[in-house]
Each structure stands twice: as C-alpha cells, then as structure tokens.
UniProtKB/Swiss-Prot annotation:
It comes from Escherichia coli (strain TW11681). This is Cyclic GMP-AMP synthase. The gene is dncV. There is a cross-link at residue 432 (Glycyl cysteine dithioester (Gly-Cys) (interchain with C-13 in Cap2)). The keyword ATP-binding applies. Disulfide bonds: none annotated.
Length: 432
C-alpha cells in the first residue's frame, strides 16, 4: 500500500501542525509574560533616572545614591552590584547623565515567536523561548554608546532579578548575550538581550513612522498588533545596532536581529508560505530526537531555505516536500552550513571533516529521517504508517485515519527560485 501523509502534517484538528502551533490563549499568555518583563524594565529605568536627576541637582552624595537605590528594585541585586550601580550613576559625566535621564527603553521581539515558527515543547524540560530585545536609544561616541555598558546590563538584570524574587519558581540566568528569566510552570523562558542604538537615527525613523500613521503605541518596537509590513518602519541601520556582551574584553558587538527576520520573511515570500510549516516540522523532529543538544533552529531554517530555494518541489505537497528536505538535509549539513551572514566566517554547522563526535551523530540521525518517511509511505497499514511517523516526530499525532491511500494525480511543481540567493543575515543572534 502507498499512503498519503499530507493530512498527517496539515490537518488543523488532529494533524502535526495542530500539535505544534500555539493556541490563541497560549500565545496571549506568552505576550502577557513578555509584557510583565517589559513593564518591570521600564519601572527600573524610571527609578534609576530619578536618582540620576537628583544627582544632577547636587542633592545626593554617593552614600545618598546608594541609600536611595536601596529603596528601588535595585535592592534585589547583590550588595556589590548595588554599590556598583550607585557608583556608576554618581560618577557619570554631565553629558552621559543627561542622556541617561532622557533614556526610554524600547522593545523588539525577535526569534521564532516573531517568525511564527515557535512550537509547543515536547519533551520534559524543553521550553518555549521568547527573545525580546531591550533597545536603548542613546548618543554613540567614538563608535561606543556613551552610557556605560555595565550600568545598562545591571539595570536590565535588576528587572529580571526582581521578578525572580517576587514570583515563585521564576529563575534568573546570566548568558553572554542576554539575561534570561525561566518560568518553569509555563514551560517558557524569556531572553532579554540589550542593544544600544543611535538616538539621532532612532528619532529620525520614529518621526517618519509617526508621519505614516504606523506608530500605534509608544514606539513601533512595542506594538504587538502591527503586521509585518508595518514593522518595516524600523529602519535603524544594521551596522549601528550594538549588542551588549557580558564575557570577554569585547563589550559590544554589531548585531541587528531584524536582519534575520527580514531574511526569513523574504525567503517565505519568494519560495512560499510552506517554508514556515517545513521549518516547524523539522524543529518538531529535532525536539523529538533530542531533549537538548540537537541542531540549532537557525541551522535548520537555513538548510530548509537553501534546499527549497534551489530544488523544484510541489508547494501543496507537504509530505513530498518533507521527503525532499529529509533526503538532502545530511549533505547540506555535511558540506558545512554557511551562515547567510557574509560578515561572519563561523559556520552554523561544520563540514564533515571538522565535525566532532556529537555533530557526526546529529548528521547520522538526520539520515534516518528520510528512511522513516519512505517506510511510512510504504507501510502495510495506516496504523503502521502512523507508528513510523511517530518515530520521527514523537507521539503527537494519534489519529491514524488522517493517513489515506494515495490517489494518483498530476502535480504542479514549484520551480527553484530564480531570484538571487537569500541575502545574508547576521548570525550573532541566538534563535530558538
């Protein structure tokens, strides 16, 4: 028997896609959690700005700054970090202090939640990941933001550590490129990378967006209701977006996550909306095979785009497209998966001759996916076909009736894109 697996993938009630996509309630809950973090970050900076304004009026000594900060959310930092925040605010030069007093954090969600490829967790311990960048429009002086790197990071950490202290089970973790707040009972963590962007450039773009009636809230960065076309109003030059780093001598790294978003959206427009579904399915396969440590989401997304960008395929045949991707995926990785970011020479995944044992195991596991999909198509019964599919994607789908006997029909194929290769993205962002 030859089985049609398209409904297994695409059925909105019982198919794989229905087990991966967040419900409206679940999506709203994630936005509410994100908003809690944003509001706390605003509050923390408002408190710190007020203290800086008092210093400007010459009404506070260093000890006075320390005592006043002890009455704010900064009290959730360690004693040493509280003292450091006090010192940094007290010792600011006048220009930096004026910048700081007028500083208003902005927020911009990035990663899979923004790309619409965020899947529900499958195995215990797996979590949904929201990457919500905090952007600081400020004066950039001699290629570095004027306001101190350490102060900004400590204030972002203050917001997360205060939430950790006030919410049972929440846990703060420090990462090189972000602060993370883990919310285990929601199977979620929120990563908060911090960026500095030029104030003058941001204000120019903000004014332009206002005139086009695009801004529906305090800033386009903060709107969760705008569609993707509206988000084009964010046009701060990519080489002016500075990501704060916590480790090593380098404090800032040029990194604009919107380049990743634009690259993926452009790829979906050029190749077809099915790219998002294929990326979801590949991430579902990854999550079923590894609880942690499988191929990264950005590497899977890049490989899928590379394959579908050049290979003829039927965009209405998800089963056939998945089989095509699964067949070519190991070679795509073994060649050395280049980042679409031409400014970064580091590969997303090393070539075969440079792979360590774990990376070789990843590729070997990839090879089994194609075999499983072929075996499922040729299984004796639909129940056997479902069992094979669940080997690949986990026991998410339970309705074997979604799998039907195949009917021969002419197929309309999508030719490979004749457009230029997808434009390069900045790989320094970590995507989930």
């Amino acid at each position: 028997m030859h089985w049609d697996l398209n409904n297994y993938y695409s059925n909105n009630m019982d198919g794989l896609i229905s087990k991966l996509k967040l419900s409206k309630t679940e999506s709203t809950k994630l936005k509410e959690l994100r908003q809690i973090v944003r509001e706390r970050t605003r509050d923390v900076f408002k408190e710190a700005r007020a203290v800086a304004a008092d210093v400007k009026k010459h009404t506070l000594t260093l000890e006075g700054v320390r005592l006043k900060l002890g009455q704010t959310n900064v009290r959730y930092l360690s004693t040493a970090d509280q003292a450091e925040v006090a010192r940094l605010i007290f010792e600011m030069d006048d220009d930096a202090r004026n910048d700081f007093i007028n500083l208003q954090p902005r927020f911009w969600t990035q990663g899979s939640f923004q790309y619409d490829t965020l899947n529900k967790p499958f195995q215990p311990g797996q979590e949904m990941d929201i990457d919500d960048g905090t952007y600081m429009p400020m004066t950039v002086f001699e290629s570095e933001p004027r306001i101190g790197h350490t102060l900004l990071l400590l204030l972002v950490d203050t917001s997360l550590k205060s939430l950790e202290a006030e919410n049972d089970g929440w846990r703060f973790e420090e990462k090189n490129t972000c602060g993370r707040i883990k919310i285990p009972h929601e199977k979620t963590h929120i990563d908060v990378p911090m960026y500095a962007i030029p104030k003058n450039q941001f204000q120019t773009k903000q004014t332009a967006a206002d005139s086009a009636h695009i801004l529906k809230s305090e800033s386009i960065f903060e709107s969760v209701a705008l569609n993707r076309d509206s988000r084009e109003a964010y046009l701060v030059e990519s080489d002016k977006v500075n990501l704060a780093l916590r480790e090593g001598a380098k404090r800032w790294s040029i990194s604009d996550p919107k380049i990743v978003e634009d690259w993926f959206n452009d790829s979906c427009k050029r190749i077809g909306g099915h790219v998002r579904s294929i990326c979801r399915f590949m991430k579902a396969w990854r999550d079923a095979q590894w609880d942690v440590g499988g191929p990264s989401s950005i590497s899977l997304m890049t490989a899928v785009v590379n394959i579908l960008n050049r290979e003829e395929h039927n965009d209405s045949d998800l089963a056939g497209t998945m089989k095509l991707v699964a067949k070519l995926l190991p070679d795509e990785f073994n060649r050395g998966l280049e980042s679409p970011d031409d400014t970064d020479t580091k590969l997303l995944f090393p070539a075969e001759w440079d792979q360590n044992v774990h990376q070789k195991t990843i590729v070997e596991t990839m090879k089994t996916l194609y075999e499983i999909l072929v075996d499922a198509e040729n299984a004796n019964t639909r129940e056997d076909a479902l069992h094979k599919m669940n080997e690949a994607f986990g026991k998410r789908v339970t309705n074997a009736q979604l799998i039907t006997s195949i009917a021969a029909a002419p197929a309309f194929h999508v030719s490979p894109s004749r457009e230029p290769e997808p434009r390069k993205i900045n790989k320094t962002m970590v995507s989930g």
